[in-house]
Amino acid sequence: AFAGILADADITAALAACKAEGTFKHGEFFTKIGLKGKSAADIKKVFGIIDQDKSDFVEEDELKLFLQNFSAGARALTDAETATFLKAGDSDGDGKIGVDEFTAMIKG
């Protein structure tokens, strides 16, 4: 799904780094998978994959399963990890993350 945008080796390393519950940190993950240095267009493509229901927003249930976008066998995020991730990205407080919020969160 991420072919041409992200390297498989980077995805594997990033997933390995947050395999244990409670170890997912979105900033570190975005850096490890090589997303931080990508163009806005590439980030938008990644957002489109994560936005499973194509609502133009990533909601809490999609964030919980965030890692599974990168590998079907990856774990779900814990409720605490999901809440932290949502809070970090949801700058307007509407309970979901839009593409501009997602881009801002990655670019940090």
Swiss-Prot record:
Matching Pfam families: EF-hand_7
Function: In muscle, parvalbumin is thought to be involved in relaxation after contraction. It binds two calcium ions.
Binding, Ca(2+) 1: D51, D53, S55, F57, E59, E62
UniProt keywords, alphabetically: Acetylation, Allergen, Calcium, Metal-binding, Muscle protein, Repeat
Protein name (database record): Parvalbumin beta 1
Family: Belongs to the parvalbumin family.
GO MF term list: calcium ion binding
Cellular component, GO annotation: cytoplasm
Modified residues (N-acetylalanine): A1
Residues noted as binding Ca(2+) 2 in the record, renumbered to the chain: D90, D92, D94, K96, E101
Xref: Gene3D superfamilies: EF-hand
Residue ranges the record marks as coiled coil: none
Domain EF-hand: 38-73, 77-108
Note: Is regarded as an important allergen.
